[in-house]
Amino acid sequence: MRQFTAVVNPTAGGATSAAALLGVARLLREAGAGLETEYSHSLAHARELARRAGERDRIVLAVGGDGMAGGIGGALSGTGAVLGLVPAGRGNDFARALGLPTDPAGIARVLLDGEPRAVDTIEVTSAVHDRTVVLGSVYAGVDALANHHANSARLLRGTASYYAGALRAVAGWRATGYRVTVDGTEHAFTGYTVVAANSGYYGFNRLIAPAAEVDDGLLEVVMIHDAPRRLFFTLMNELGTGAHVHRPQVRVLRGREVRIEADRAIPYGADGEVDAAVPVTARVLPGALRVLSEPGAAS
């Protein structure tokens, strides 16, 4: 029977994470699986706990949102250890990209009977990140600023916090000159953001890169050019379906390595964590992580 180690950060949405784990834990134990729980005091500590558990050949459960999934998944990338996801955050974008359930019974089913699926990860290099590995996307611009505001929100949750953060970010945003180098070819433009996406979803289930696949060895590079604010909000609404990619203000490229530079120190984010400014380089690591997925979904 499978042996699990759940890593929970009690200081980051801890009540929600603990509640999500409770129902799943009961079902795992009733099925005869072994489960131990580790509580982290920071994302760096969570990564270390995950590495130790993986070294003991335990399946490591990331309990929380995309920041926790990205941190723990990044720590396990390239190690051969297996990751299980217990979605309990505001976005859960990477779990959504994998088609994972969010109800306790569905989560437990995948953890007990699912198959490890090899997925790509992203290596991030900047003045702050020294080859840090994340799962979903790296984005630089107004969306990173919106994400920062959403993370700081105290009264709002989920999509409401993201939209409030976006309104605040866009209101004070000025067009930025970007230099985006994709596999050695430079592309210059003025605009709102650049997203290097492994997962199609980001920003609380917004479909930023509809063609992105987590196991194709490529990053989708979405560049949103300068546009009137009214049109930008239309683009934001179209992120729900991915229809924005058909707009002339949106350009999509593909590549294995993406470097993002700008004419000012704009923020960038990675899997919901915003703590640095460009320049930043994102490089895909093909098939570097094994994640438990629905039976039959393994590649």
Language-model-derived ranges and their functions:
Residues 182, 188, 213, 223-299:
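ATP/nucleoside-binding phosphotransfer catalytic cores, i.e., glycine-rich phosphate-binding loops
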Residues 31, 40, 77-82, 88-192:
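Catalytic core of DAGKc-family lipid kinases
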Residues 46, 66, 194:
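Short conserved active-site loop signatures built around small residues
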Residues 10, 63-65, 86-88:
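Glycine-rich beta-strand-to-loop/alpha-helix junction loops that act as flexible
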Residues 68-79:
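Short Gly/Thr/Asp-enriched flexible loops that form oxyanion-binding sites at enzyme active sites
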Residues 139, 143, 195-210, 274:
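Glycine-rich phosphate/pyrophosphate-binding beta-alpha loops
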